[in-house]
């Protein structure tokens, strides 16, 4: 659906979790067992955590993490540069536990399905396109899509029969039929078309009403789309480059919003992590269950 107009239900007040600035914050994930928010700073090569009592801390340095999932045992599965997958537990990272056959590529956004598989995108390079893969629980990869222009936000409908997949540079969110039994996708269609908008769609989150919340890179905002792809709400953010979002807290009723710094550092609140109460609740966390 082409987004020519905007119907706003409400403008939500914003807050910041701290004054800490990231270079390129991505992939926020709420860890229920730890009552903490994790995210990655891709450019700074760091994995970070926020706890309401302790503030922000860097839990790991020297890791280029495009995205990650929370395993059912509470550890983190890290999707990294060079097409490799690592494992984080108790402050320690084990790198290269799994890898793609292709080289010179970096994983970007990822999401777990309800059966423990992981859908994961890889970035295009000068000599190769981006791809979308599925990582099965036995540690094997299957390529689902090729020639992808900057794969980004991934999410599922409430009944898990629809997969949402964002191509940022094409400014489109696609929808596919998803087969839970096999993990295969089919019948791609355009869910939302942002080519006449000022922003580019980035990370996404889905609420319990089936609405899709999309971070808007370059447009100082997060938009909410109903199940037909129509924009029904918007949250304004005091940072131009909004990268991703997730629901968190015990009731999944708080939205956490990551951003990146502009080319000129310390402009507005760029690079900070924001929080809002959107009046919606997020779907329960889906854990990965990859044998590592």
For every predicted segment, state its role.
Residues 176-183, 278-282:
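Short loop/turn segments immediately following beta-strands, especially the blade-tip
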Residues 46-48, 84, 131-133, 172-174, ...:
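A short loop-to-beta-strand structural motif that recurs across blades of beta-propeller domains
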Residues 52, 72-73, 89-91, 133-139, ...:
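Flexible "stalk/tail and boundary" regions
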Residues 14-18, 55-60, 94-100, 140-146, ...:
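A short beta-strand motif characteristic of beta-propeller blades
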Residues 250-292:
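Blade-level signature of beta-propeller repeat domains, shared across WD40, Kelch, NHL, RCC1
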């Amino acid at each position: 659906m082409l987004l020519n107009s905007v119907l706003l239900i409400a403008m939500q007040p914003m807050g910041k979790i701290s004054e800490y600035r990231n270079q390129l914050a991505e992939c926020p994930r709420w860890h229920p067992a730890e009552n903490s928010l994790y995210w990655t700073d891709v450019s700074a090569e760091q994995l970070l955590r926020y706890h309401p009592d302790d503030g922000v801390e860097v839990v790991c340095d020297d890791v280029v993490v495009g995205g990650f999932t929370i395993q059912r045992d509470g550890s983190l599965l890290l999707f990294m540069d060079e097409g490799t997958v690592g494992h984080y537990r108790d402050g320690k990272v084990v790198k290269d536990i799994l890898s793609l056959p292709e080289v010179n590529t970096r994983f970007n956004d990822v999401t777990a399905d309800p059966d423990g598989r992981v859908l994961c995108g890889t970035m295009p390079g000068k000599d190769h396109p981006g791809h979308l893969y599925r990582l099965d629980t036995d540690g094997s990869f299957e390529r689902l899509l090729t020639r992808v222009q900057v794969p980004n936000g991934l999410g599922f409908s409430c009944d898990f029969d629809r997969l949402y997949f964002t191509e940022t540079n094409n400014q489109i969110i696609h929808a596919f039929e998803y087969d839970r039994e096999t993990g295969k996708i089919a019948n791609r269609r355009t869910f939302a078309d942002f080519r006449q908008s000022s922003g580019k769609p980035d990370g996404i989150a889905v609420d319990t009403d089936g609405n899709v919340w999309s971070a808007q890179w370059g447009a100082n905002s997060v938009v909410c789309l109903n199940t037909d792809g129509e924009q029904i709400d918007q949250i304004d953010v005091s940072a131009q480059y909004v990268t991703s979002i997730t629901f968190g807290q015990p009731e999944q009723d708080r939205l956490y919003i990551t951003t990146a710094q502009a080319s000129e550092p310390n402009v507005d609140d760029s690079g900070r992590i924001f929080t809002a109460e959107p009046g919606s609740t997020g779907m329960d966390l889906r854990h990965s269950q990859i044998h590592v």
